[in-house]
Design a protein with these regions (language model features):
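Conserved nucleotide-cofactor-binding alpha/beta core module
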Residues: 105-133, 140
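Short helix/loop capping segments that flank catalytic or ligand/cofactor-binding pockets
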Residues: 87-89, 115-118, 171-172, 211
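Glycine-/small-residue-rich active-site loops that bind phosphorylated ligands and cofactors
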Residues: 83-85, 113-114, 135-138, 168-169
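Short, flexible loop segments at the rims of nucleotide/cofactor-binding pockets, characterized by
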Residues: 51-55, 106, 137-141
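Structural motif
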Residues: 77-79, 107, 129, 161-163
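Membrane-anchoring hydrophobic helices of lipid-metabolizing enzymes
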Residues: 1-76, 82-93, 97, 119, ...
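A short alpha->loop->secondary-structure connector
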Residues: 96-104
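Non-catalytic C-terminal accessory region of glycerolipid acyltransferases
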Residues: 138-353
Length: 353
């Protein structure tokens, strides 16, 4: 990773140690990051986390590897499913840097800036901020600004990472959010031309075990019992810490080819699609992205001890009115949905071949 100087922020004290802006970073058990020089070598930290919490992280490919590598060479827009708040983009950056010597620019929502050190950490990295939670007019202006910035990066052949949706899919039913795609394609050109200019290359992220599964199930019951329930800032921080520290088993990042040839073939066969309402055009592209991601899942076989694993996660959930039957089903659902979506994508592929 490359870290950049932040203007008007005092990072070092007189003894060349980090200021109090970074005191909360100890929550991540990285108290040895005492100086900026230490901070600049955060990549080894990602390796340490990988060794301690996984049985290996593998970079895999779906389809023509040479074509995927050509897409990367010319700058790719990596769009992934969203499993972990911190590590999805961090480990992808590590894998791409080790294999291809590139570092994608990373989009992150400002809703995660619960503490000052998180914002500073983000701005040190090759990150840009996706502003959320504003009024309708401000949201539109923010989207236009973001779209222009992304187009600028793409015009320079830079690679970019963004999750397919705002927030993680609690039930692991990974579907691209049309509003995210719309935000990326604001401009004077035709919608499909804007999508093609992005050069979207979907990436599938699969964890054998999700360390945040019990937290997600807990949130689903809280939301069920009180539809007005909203996460607090500290809930996201707790998810970050659990996601980083928790055991994940095997982890696979699978790169898939650019969706551009598929879009171009679709428009050749159906030129009338350019005249469809915007929400229909968005859904057509979202469906293509989803199929790529679903096809790229690594499907792990579950052994006889999986039921015991689910019960152990259920035991970690603390709620005053704990609905064990509901929570157990939500936990099973998280691990069932990727396999179901993978099978649906395979069926679609076989039907349309």
């Amino acid at each position: 990773m490359v870290f950049y100087v932040i203007k008007n922020v005092k990072l070092l004290d007189d003894k060349r140690r980090m200021t109090n802006d970074f005191k909360d970073i100890r929550a991540y058990r990285v108290g040895w990051l005492l100086t900026i020089c230490d901070f600049l070598f955060a990549f080894p930290l990602l390796r340490i986390w990988a060794l301690r919490t996984t049985k290996g992280i593998r970079l895999a490919y779906m389809g023509d590897r040479k074509q995927i590598e050509a897409d990367i060479k010319h700058g790719a827009f990596f769009m992934t499913n969203h499993r972990d708040i911190v590590l999805d983009s961090a480990w992808l950056s590590l894998l791409l840097r080790c294999r291809y010597f590139i570092r994608p620019f990373i989009g992150i929502g400002n809703n995660l800036f619960a503490y000052k050190w998180i914002e500073l950490f983000v701005r040190f990295n090759r990150c840009f901020v996706v502003k959320r939670g504003a009024g309708a007019h401000a949201q539109l202006e923010n989207a236009k600004q973001l779209s222009a910035y992304i187009n600028h990066l793409r015009s320079q052949g830079k690679s970019i990472w963004l999750a397919q949706r705002e927030g993680r899919a609690k039930d692991s039913n990974d579907l691209t959010q049309p509003s995210v795609l719309h935000m990326l394609t604001l401009g004077e050109k035709d919608f499909f031309d804007n999508v093609i200019a992005l050069n979207i290359c979907p990436v599938s992220i699969t964890y054998e075990y999700d360390p945040c599964d019990y937290l997600k199930a807990r949130e689903m019951q809280l939301k069920r019992d009180n539809p007005k329930w909203r996460k607090r800032a500290k809930d996201d921080v707790e998810s970050m810490k659990t996601g980083i520290r928790g055991k994940k088993g095997r982890v696979v990042y699978r790169l898939t080819p650019s969706i551009n040839p598929e879009i171009e073939a679709m428009l050749t066969a159906h030129p009338e699609y350019r005249q469809l309402p915007m929400h229909d055009q968005l859904q057509l592209v979202c469906d293509i992205i989803d199929r790529h991601i679903h096809l790229g899942y690594e499907i792990f076989e579950r052994g006889t001890d999986f039921d015991a694993y689910i019960e152990s996660r259920l035991a970690k959930i603390e709620l005053p009115n704990k609905d064990e039957a509901f929570l157990r089903e939500r936990l099973y659902e998280m691990y069932r949905n990727p396999k179901m979506n993978h099978q649906k994508a395979l069926s679609h592929l076989m039907t349309n071949d």
